[in-house]
């Protein structure tokens, strides 16, 4: 395969050399592609639009030994709303980063392409953070990392309670009894029962019905942190854009009236504080 066509999204774009950009593309047919767009940083470059983050375009690519080369590009969608709203932009950046870290070049994932493409549109009509969390849970589920959110990941009993331990190492939520059993107690984050219920809906529900869901500021912060923690621990990689976005979430009061910054902390399974 010398020259080939690919309809792809730009999920990462960074400077490369004096006037080039190194693009990470994600296509339905080929999965992730690393390609150099030569000369696109020059003001008069005709291919400049095709090297912008989140652009969806038809690319004519030349296959190289380590990096492909963009020969021609025909932009189809630029998602302009992502550049006019900070929350939308940060959610899209977080999703693109997760997709990049969770996949390898040359492995097609048509379902993930559809999920990503749809989610970039959806942030305009739904809470961007809600779309971001849904995207993370569905992506991880597709890759085989479905968290157990109904039954205890350790004993299989249905979980109940106002505060539950969410442990990626265990594979999901852990009941009170299993939290302290054994020589190595489960490690994770405490999640409220309400947030856990919403996480179930995000994982199992349809994207088209996402705008029907509502969450408060406390649930937003809690689920964003739990989603990031789950992805990072499972993939063993750091999500930098997620950390930045979480810091910008406006912290309110949790349902008990206590400041949620004082309530949220890592735990070792021996207690909530």
UniProtKB/Swiss-Prot annotation:
Q: Which PANTHER family match?
A: DNA REPAIR PROTEIN RECO (PTHR33991:SF1)
Q: Which InterPro entries match?
A: ARFGAP/RecO (IPR037278), DNA_rep/recomb_RecO_N (IPR022572), NA-bd_OB-fold (IPR012340), RecO (IPR003717), RecO_C (IPR042242)
Q: Which GO terms describe its cellular component?
A: bacterial nucleoid
Which keywords has UniProt assigned to this entry?
DNA damage, DNA recombination, DNA repair
The keyword DNA repair appears for this protein: yes
Task: State its role.
Answer: Involved in DNA repair and RecF pathway recombination.
The entry sums up its family as follows: Belongs to the RecO family.
State the superkingdom: Bacteria
Which residues does the annotated region (Disordered) include?
250-273
List all Basic and acidic residues biased stretches.
257-273
Q: What is this protein called?
A: DNA repair protein RecO
Q: Name one GO biological process term.
A: DNA recombination
